[in-house]
Regions:
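Nucleic-acid endonuclease domains
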Residues: 1-87, 93-132
Length: 132
């Protein structure tokens, strides 16, 4: 069961989605058994990539490859979009559609997280907006 959380509207930071992020999302999505799961994994992967870029801009060290979202078995079995913040734990990166007023967080991602980064897809996936 997902828990909806209100999304603040006061600040946002637009970040371009790199070709590398699109490529990684495509690779992970193609490994999925259904179109629905592929779309979920694609959006989650883009959210993690943009969350990673955002934290790097802030000078925060991350290890995306140590994240559950980079583990093929966990990615297949769960709705994960985590990013490891080195020395601190996992940050959840969630994507929402344009105009969304809530962000659903799956049960498996509601505990043991440092916090949440919510990104909104804009302009046919050319960039995501980090909602702060």
């Amino acid at each position: 069961m997902n828990s909806p959380n209100p999304i603040p509207n006061d600040t946002s930071i637009p970040l371009w989605i790199t070709q590398s992020a699109h490529h990684q999302a495509d690779v992970f999505a193609r490994q999925q058994p259904s179109p629905q799961k592929a779309e979920q994994v694609y959006r989650n992967t883009l959210a993690v990539c943009v969350g990673n870029s955002y934290l790097k801009l802030l000078g925060i060290q991350t290890d995306v490859t140590a994240s559950d979202s980079w583990n093929a078995v966990i990615r297949l079995a769960s709705d994960v979009a985590d990013l490891v913040v080195v020395g601190h734990g996992q940050l959840e990166c969630r994507a929402v559609a344009p105009g969304a007023e809530t962000c659903s967080v799956p049960l498996e991602s509601q505990c043991d997280r440092l916090g949440y980064v919510v990104v909104r897809h804009e302009h046919q996936n050319t960039f995501l907006v980090v909602l702060v």
